[in-house]
């Protein structure tokens, strides 16, 4: 009986850990929904105004003057701490993102997606 209980606990805990592993795939989906409208590589076609520059990408292009990519998905220097801090607390013109908009688990997924190219 004890072995069965122990086995169930191990299997249950393993499933819990797997469910908590950040997902780059889900991170891309969350990024596309919440971040790409300002920080994407390509501006979506706007019926009223045509194709325009993205506010976040344009601001970063001016700030970095070609020294770093303006498109967040191309960056290799973004750390998990930096991403989480900017998302939750904002920076310059970027507003905060509440946990009711992007949960901590979703933010972890975005971090996994944006840090996939992190310099080792």
Regions from the PLM with identified roles:
Residues 1-5, 95:
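Bacterial N-terminal signal peptides that target proteins for export
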Residues 4-13:
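Sec-dependent N-terminal signal peptides
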Residues 15-32, 41, 45-47:
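Electrostatic cytochrome c docking/interface patches
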Residues 28, 40-85:
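Gly/Gly-Pro-rich "capping" loops immediately C-terminal to redox-active cysteine motifs
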Residues 31-42, 94, 110, 114:
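The canonical Cys-X-X-Cys-His
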Residues 35, 57, 91:
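Short amphipathic alpha-helical/adjacent loop interface patches that line ligand
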Residues 44, 117-120:
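Inter-heme linker and motif-flanking segments adjacent to c-type heme-binding CXXCH motifs
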Residues 64-78, 82-117:
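Axial heme c-ligation environment in periplasmic c-type cytochrome domains
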